Amino acid sequence: MLAELHKTTPEETREQRLTLGLWLRSLREHQGLSQRDLAEILSLDYYTFISQLENGRGKIPAHRYVEWAHALDQDPKSFVRTLLQYYEPMTYKVLFEEEQS
């Protein structure tokens, strides 16, 4: 398993964040929320932070994961697990993927 772990390239990181951003956008839209609405619920100073995340730039701060999960009507554990899969793919693999014989 460890042999399969590799450092992600900047391009891979960008693609992962963009995929995650599309997922976040779909969750927000499913709730019928605008970016401004979500920013207000989360007490963010700038709604443009939502736009940045949805476009693959930036990360949700770890100390805000549970707030985001609740705002998007998601189970916090599942939400964080998905974030981890895209923000920290090597850590995700170590924690959650089955060892290969």
Predicted regions located by residue number:
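Short, basic-rich loop-to-helix N-cap that marks the start of a DNA-contacting helix
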Residues: G32, G56-A71
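DNA major-groove recognition helix of helix-turn-helix
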Residues: L42, L53-E54, R64, L83
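Short, charged recognition helix plus adjacent turn
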Residues: L5-H6, H70, S78-S101
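A short, Lys/Arg-rich alpha-helix, primarily the initiator
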Residues: L2-H30
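Short alpha-helical DNA-recognition segment
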Residues: H30-Q52
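Alpha-helix N-cap/N′ positions at the starts of helices
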Residues: Q16-T19, D45, I60
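Residues within the helices of the helix-turn-helix
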Residues: R25-S26, R36, V66
